[in-house]
UniProtKB/Swiss-Prot annotation:
Recorded name of the encoding gene: pdxT
Residues binding L-glutamine, per UniProt: G46, E47, S48, R105, I133, R134
Assembly information from the UniProt record: In the presence of PdxS, forms a dodecamer of heterodimers. Only shows activity in the heterodimer.
Family membership noted in the UniProt record: Belongs to the glutaminase PdxT/SNO family.
Protein name: Pyridoxal 5'-phosphate synthase subunit PdxT
Organism: Geobacillus thermodenitrificans (strain NG80-2)
PANTHER family in the cross-refs: PYRIDOXAL 5'-PHOSPHATE SYNTHASE SUBUNIT SNO, PYRIDOXAL 5'-PHOSPHATE SYNTHASE SUBUNIT SNO1-RELATED
Active site: C78 (nucleophile), H169 (charge relay system), E171 (charge relay system)
SUPFAM superfamilies noted in UniProt: Class I glutamine amidotransferase-like
UniProt catalytic activity: aldehydo-D-ribose 5-phosphate + D-glyceraldehyde 3-phosphate + L-glutamine = pyridoxal 5'-phosphate + L-glutamate + phosphate + 3 H2O + H(+); L-glutamine + H2O = L-glutamate + NH4(+)
EC assignment: 4.3.3.6, 3.5.1.2
GO cellular component term, pick one: cytosol
Family annotation (CDD domains): GATase1_PB
One GO MF term attached to the UniProt entry: glutaminase activity
Lineage: Bacteria, Bacillati, Bacillota, Bacilli, Bacillales
């Protein structure tokens, strides 16, 4: 199983290590042609507006949308969640606009720029430590979206079909259960596409 990590900016190597720790092959994606042959893609945390500029500069917007249209799973963490969202509070247009959610950037306030919280994640388990760094949260979800985790009544993880998104940085701990959950999504998608 080959998983790409969008390597334009952000916590790229940490995701590579998490993918490899789960027994899959990781590929850092910086060019369009590197999307070929991938089974899934991680959109890492970083700074969403910088990532968007780089996506545009390297001509990755349409290839990423095509990757999604081909039914391949995508996992967005922190800034990656913002890239996936169809709606962003205070912005007229989304980035990739693939997941039927509304997100608010930096929504935990400056006093809480960075913190850790123990989460219970549906399909993953309890006692998962979420590392939040200038994190967004999901304000609203569409009918097809399943809420997987909340923190202080805010949605911090959700899934819609082939798309998985979370507000926190799962790659910054040694608990790889959420990455395993994503890899299972990728396995399921591969099974369906080969039928």
């Amino acid at each position: 199983m080959k998983i790409g990590v969008l390597g334009l900016q952000g916590a790229v190597q940490e995701h590579v290590r998490a993918i490899e720790a789960c027994g899959a092959e990781a590929v850092v994606v910086k060019k369009t042609e590197q999307l070929t042959g991938l089974d899934g893609l991680v959109l890492p945390g970083g700074e969403s507006t910088t990532m968007r500029r780089l996506i545009d500069r390297y001509g990755l917007m349409e290839p990423l949308k095509q990757f999604a249209a081909d039914g391949k799973p995508m996992f967005g963490t922190c800034a990656g969640l913002i890239l996936l969202a169809k709606r962003i509070v205070g912005y007229d247009e989304p980035h990739l606009g693939l997941m039927d959610i509304t997100v608010e950037r930096n929504s935990f306030g400056r006093q809480r720029e960075s913190f850790e919280a123990e989460l219970s994640i549906k399909g993953v388990g309890d006692g998962f430590v979420g590392v939040f760094i200038r994190a967004p949260h999901i304000v609203e979800v569409g009918d097809e979206v399943e809420v997987l985790a909340t923190y202080n009544d805010r949605i911090v993880a959700a899934r819609q079909g082939q798309f998985l998104g979370c507000s926190f940085h799962p790659e910054l701990t040694d608990d790889h259960r959420l990455m395993r959950y994503f890899l299972n999504m990728v396995k399921e998608a591969k099974t369906v596409s080969s039928i």
